[in-house]
């Protein structure tokens, strides 16, 4: 929220799209980011769309030679490329368009020649602010994942706007005009609103762009060339929603960035901006958390109670935000989100167990649900686990006398050759492996939906999420294989509510697709291995009926599959910690 606007009656300049930006090293660097084919395509667009925001190219004032009219040969056009001076400027727009679409697009012509042609011949005085902004956005259009976007939310006053839908009253053009008036109190700037393709023109696939799903605002400081041609602040407003995707900055520090977002909130009729709640870790985050009041507002009046949602794919973030029941807050009830929310199918429909025998969050896709309990053995997959090599003590036993070997019989290795199984056993294991694979595929389809066509991955119904973070408050399992009881009293540790609990984070380019593959591959199962001797303690008294079976040999120990040691705490009723009293962060989204 803007607290202290400029007291000056005369506002600072808000540059228009047609204002001139002289050539500079920064502008040359911005031009050099594009490939030569992209430069040719962009210049062709400038020549075809002669709008008021574009500066027209400089043409030659020489009259065409007798009998030549406006058409020229390719040889003459090549001379125009190699001889960069006024004498070689084109006489008409058609001639210039022919130059850029013909010889200039030849791969033998270097990109440096095209850059020199723009800066010295066709646009020697400079480009407009709109043309500079298109240079930046043309680069981002072809590289959709080149920026990292974070989510903020516009907060509206319920007393003024009871419906909380003030963002629907203003169009993107009105917001741009009001935003320019607000920013004029603080610094000289330029705001570029990227035009979206009209719905009736979207039939042609060539004109579609991922930016058409947003109202794209690019804000830069002016008039210094390094600021005009710099990164700037990019704001993607989801139309008819209070959500913004933000990337970039204005100058050094975060003051100008927060000031511009507060001005955007005022332009959209909102009272303040809601940022992601800072995670305690750094000294700056701890200081900011200490400054927040009971309502979660900082000294500037900005709220910081929103759950963190960021990523490189703006369309994936948009898909999450557009769902009316989506939740970004870490304290929100994830079970309230329907099947369409990021999480995919039934994997998002987990209900928290309130006691009893009902399924809870511990039965989700990351932990094998109760319905998927099966024999924990690799033989279901048609694989017989090999016997580990003999330890040093076992090798010594072989070389000792017969009296010593009788006290501890040597373990016999199991042969892995095909002749080690009868045909009936081989056939049975093959049938069991096939049944298991079909069951795993069925469960993956139930949890995450059907697998997409590998030749058309765009039809995948799973939303692309780059990070899923869980904060679970549950006791640590008593894993005797790690000798935890010899290090710390786990009972006392788990009974202390102040002790840190378990946090789980999954990251990747497509987390849900990865989980679907793991479930389909049967990696949520477990196998067994031979005990290396670390299992000591209370577990030694269990399963007395099997003690004689493994007497004289090494007792097998269960190995957990995906997600590993969390399988051991399934009986502890894993639950997510409920929201503290008075916490309204679950309503932020």
Swiss-Prot record:
Residues 398-425 have a biased composition (Polar residues). Residues 426-445 have a biased composition (Basic and acidic residues). It comes from the Eukaryota. It holds the Pfam family CENP-N. Residues 328-365, 379-459, 525-555, 569-589 are annotated as: Disordered. GO terms for biological process: CENP-A containing chromatin assembly; chromosome segregation. Residues 536-545 have a biased composition (Acidic residues). This is Putative uncharacterized protein UM10309. It comes from Mycosarcoma maydis.
